[in-house]
Amino acid sequence: TIYAIRLQSKRETFYATLAGRRMPTFATAGGRAMLACLDERHADDILRRSRLVPLTPRTLVDPDQIRARIAEARRDGYACVQEESLMGEIVVAAAVVKDRSMPVGAIH
């Protein structure tokens, strides 16, 4: 996942900048939402090739737990993560798809 822009509210201050930064697909709401749009075999192949290194103490790195969250996103049409890529951050994301199936990005 690559973040293009990040807008902060009037009440919150960001202490980390994500714009232009790459984040692991398995640990972000946008990444999981996009993986949920793929067939299970393709998503599993991407997950298998990923370095499952925690970004925070709350990052899921167990492949079965990550697969379960991807399945939830597939069922619900969106993904949620809580403090898995940045502490103090809760993110909800939905994939942006091309031709009704190929994910090309995500809205967080």
Residue ranges and their predicted role:
Residues T1-R49:
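Amphipathic alpha-helical effector-binding/dimerization core
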Residues F26, C37, L55, G77-Y78, ...:
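Broad hydrophobic/π-residue packing in well-ordered secondary structure
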Residues A43, R51-L52, R75-A79:
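Generic structural signal for secondary-structure transition and capping sites
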Residues D45-I46, T56, Q82:
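Short, hydrophobic secondary-structure boundary micro-motifs
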Residues L55-T56, M87:
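Intrinsically disordered, low-complexity polar/acidic regions
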Residues P57-V61:
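Substrate-recognition "cap/lid" segment bordering the active-site pocket of phosphatases
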Residues D62-H108:
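Extended hydrophobic
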